[in-house]
From Swiss-Prot:
Entry binding sites for substrate: T10, K42, L74, R88
Binding-site positions, ATP: T10, F11, H18, G89, L90, R91, E99, N124, S125, F126, I127, S128, S129, T130
Domain of life of the source: Bacteria
Name of this chain's protein: Phosphopantetheine adenylyltransferase
Keyword flag Nucleotidyltransferase: yes
InterPro entries the UniProt entry points to: Cyt_trans-like, PPAT, Rossmann-like_a/b/a_fold
Species name: Shewanella pealeana (strain ATCC 700345 / ANG-SQ1)
Length: 159
């Protein structure tokens, strides 16, 4: 069965937790589209173009992964990409309530779009983009939480 999946997010920045889920999704689905949301309401540290480039670097070794920036409704983006599955990560129980509401809203807007939830590897379960940015902002070493190119980009942004 040919399944195209979308792993959506802001990815500001992409972390090792995200990379772990991307690799596992790439093993589960024939084609995975990393949908990077423009999401100006979040005031991202990195521009959409920068986030796309960082994700392309992190996923360069995965032949069935494509990185695309988008704006607008996720369900519309999924339809444009001919995707039938949304991949979402759940780090903790606290993520579940929001993700459950989001999955139900997406199902209401697009009944054929299925949500699949993956949990991160234990060593990545506490990592969030927000925490990584906070550590980097205060001069901390984030290289154990993100790809080296992402760590370098964060260091440049912090200066």
């Amino acid at each position: 069965m040919h399944k195209r999946a979308i792993y959506p997010g802001t990815f500001d920045p992409v972390t090792n937790g995200h990379a772990d889920l991307i690799e596992r999704a790439a093993n589960l689905f024939e084609h995975v589209i990393i949908g990077i949301a423009a999401n100006p309401s979040k005031q991202p540290r990195f521009t959409l173009a920068e986030r796309v480039e960082l994700l392309k670097t992190v996923t360069a070794h995965l032949d069935n992964v494509e990185v695309v920036g988008f704006s607008g409704l996720l369900v519309d983006f999924a339809k444009d990409q001919n995707a039938s599955v949304l991949v979402r990560g759940l780090r903790a129980v606290s993520d579940f309530e929001y993700e459950f509401q989001l999955a139900n809203m997406n199902r209401r807007l697009s009944p054929d779009l299925e949500s699949v939830f993956l949990t991160p590897a234990e060593e990545n379960s506490f990592i969030s983009s927000t925490l990584v940015k906070e550590v980097a902002l205060h001069g901390g070493d984030v290289s154990q939480f993100v790809h080296i190119e992402v760590a370098n980009a964060l260091t440049k942004k912090a200066k």
